[in-house]
């Protein structure tokens, strides 16, 4: 399907909300448009196509989308040929697409999480027939391979290995909007990684809602540990990361693969969500506090230099002060290198939304602030331990905060900023850490 647009400049702008899975979906949307002659811009004023790729994990993300959609009304009035598309998880929710069209009738295209590959077709219909397109598929179809991808980085890339989730945690809407678990064939994954390496990529991150479930439903006999060992054999690849792991499915085989495979980075993102066994049961997480702490001990004993990061939800329905203190003490015991902390957000059609004992906002915010303070104190102490050490860093590009500096990450995920020549981008360099900051390290090149 070719896209036709009479405008001299064929520019598009994509705003992405949410997780790395959404980021990779946006890279595919961008790739499809670029393959049709469009160029990307960050300036909505000059774009002929504006896409919002949405998230619905928290209410805050939805409110941002509504606010930004409202701001496009004047742009559409100024430029009636502007095409506005909205897609992603938020649109997959029951009734959301109709709500958006009723509130923002100037939106041209709406689609969900299962049919992003059909975007060129929808765009063609809007441009050629002047119609409004809304198509939300209620059931996931097969995995579409071979879509063009416009990567954000020339050094590291996301590679999705599976889609969907079967876990149904009581607070989470993801299984309802992303569908059931589907794994890509390992040969397709390896082929994509080999192509990336041939283009000069040094690091890949394997993505999935729960990567440890990889392989279920495939004809070939392979699990996640087996896939990791296959990926480790790709010549020219320097580093491999993965996310996200569900603690209940992180097997001994995966731990041993991280230990034994030289390209697998010593970093595990292991969402705990709560340190209270009672709350974990209410969340339907299928593990308790003791199981999680035993798993952490096992990981640390097999992989001594490992960094552990996590996700934590504060203010889940029924959470008492005692439950919260359990979370604080677990964080102290584990000693996370960083944590993504969230205030519980009610989501329609999830079991937790119907639970009694919803926590008042002021208590949620107080606990959230106490947790962040406790975690940050620990992170500062852990970062201090790097001062004077020499670490290997993959140089990713200019630092976001200071473009005169370069930035990169250690094998175990620590962010390091340093002065150096831009020719080093994409290279592995040894840096001596001269100063630790709360959320990053400052290094100097070791000659």
Swiss-Prot record:
Picking any one GO molecular function of the record gives:
4 iron, 4 sulfur cluster binding
| Localization per Swiss-Prot or TrEMBL | Cytoplasm
Its EC number(s): 2.8.4.3
Gene3D superfamilies given in the database record: Methylthiotransferase, N-terminal domain, tm_1862 like domain
Where does it sit, as one GO cellular component term? cytosol
Q: At the top level of its lineage, which domain of life is listed?
A: Bacteria
Q: Which cofactor does it need?
A: [4Fe-4S] cluster
Q: Which stretches make up the Radical SAM core domain?
A: 151-382
Q: Which residues form a coiled coil?
A: none
PROSITE patterns membership: MTTASE_N (PS51449), MTTASE_RADICAL (PS01278), RADICAL_SAM (PS51918), TRAM (PS50926)
State the free-text cofactor note: Binds 2 [4Fe-4S] clusters. One cluster is coordinated with 3 cysteines and an exchangeable S-adenosyl-L-methionine.
Domain TRAM residue range list? 384-447
Name the record gives this protein: tRNA-2-methylthio-N(6)-dimethylallyladenosine synthase
Q: Which gene encodes it?
A: miaB
